[in-house]
Design a protein with these regions (language model features):
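N-terminal glycine-rich FAD/FM-binding segment characteristic of electron-transfer flavoproteins
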Residues: 1-260
Length: 263
């Protein structure tokens, strides 16, 4: 029996998944809030950040200062460290309860795991690794015999190995979901004292056979930078020829305030 189509008019608001690791918000969370504010302005709606974790409520303050209008906090010991199943259950519960029109997730290691899992469970589409998001008509150019729908999320991403650019829409299902590449969108200036409405939501997280147990976490120690935060990279490989020549690249990176990477 065919499932009834969802009432698209029930879905409102631009939501973002506010990634945090070790109770520290990732930069992508602020970038998504910045882009969400632009989209929300076009739709005359609000921006809601979804914050999942354990003892993370205090992070809602910073999300408000960067532009979020509301923060939904799901605080549960099962969410202390990222695991696919409990995080997917939590985000699916938020979507089913609050019905966002748009749901944005960072295209990080976590987001690339969480986003597709959630989109499959709520039976909607997801466009991955987006580099541009805007509100517009779909089809972009009116076509005879085909309805042109307005106020759609147009999601642009590289395709076919980067040889072409595709613009994708999800006109018949909600939420419209996308993962967004870090470093592409701009975060807004921090507005000290700006407060978001904080909503505490506590869905039941059911342990099942998809749960995994984290036995241990070993964190690397050293002066290793996160290249996702870098504007410029100096990279060297086998072609450098020797350890001595590689030091020249290290010197270049140090004087130009860039990061040195290996391919």
């Amino acid at each position: 029996m065919e499932e009834p189509k969802m009432g698209l008019e029930e879905y409102k608001g631009v939501y973002i998944y506010a990634q945090q690791v070790d109770n520290k918000l990732s930069n992508i969370a602020f970038e998504l809030v910045g882009k969400a504010k632009e989209l929300a302005a076009d739709l005359n709606t609000e921006v809601t950040a979804v914050l999942l974790g354990s003892n993370v409520k205090a992070l809602a303050t910073e999300l408000g200062e960067y532009g979020a209008d509301k923060v939904i906090v799901v605080d549960n010991p099962a969410l202390e460290t990222y695991r696919t199943e409990p995080y997917a259950q939590a985000l699916v519960s938020v979507i089913n309860e609050y019905k966002p029109e748009i749901m944005l997730v960072g295209a990080t290691a976590i987001g690339r795991d969480l986003g597709p899992t959630v989109s499959a469970r709520v039976k909607t589409g997801l466009t991955a690794d987006c580099t541009k998001l805007e509100i517009g008509d779909f089809p972009i150019n009116a076509m005879p015999g085909q309805e042109q729908k307005h106020n759609q999320l147009l999601m642009t991403r590289p395709a076919f190995g980067g040889n072409t650019i595709a613009t994708i829409a999800c006109p018949d299902n909600r939420p419209q979901m996308a993962t967004v590449r870090p470093g592409v969108m701009q975060k807004l200036p921090k507005e000290a004292g700006r407060a978001a409405e904080v909503i505490e939501f506590n869905p039941t997280l059911e342990e099942n056979n998809r749960y995994v147990e984290i036995m241990d976490i070993v964190k690397a120690v050293g002066n290793v930078e996160n290249i996702m935060d870098a504007k410029v990279l100096v990279s060297g490989g086998r072609g450098v020829g020797s350890a001595e020549n590689f030091e020249m690249l290290r010197d270049l990176a140090s004087v130009s305030y860039t990061h040195l990477t290996l391919p």
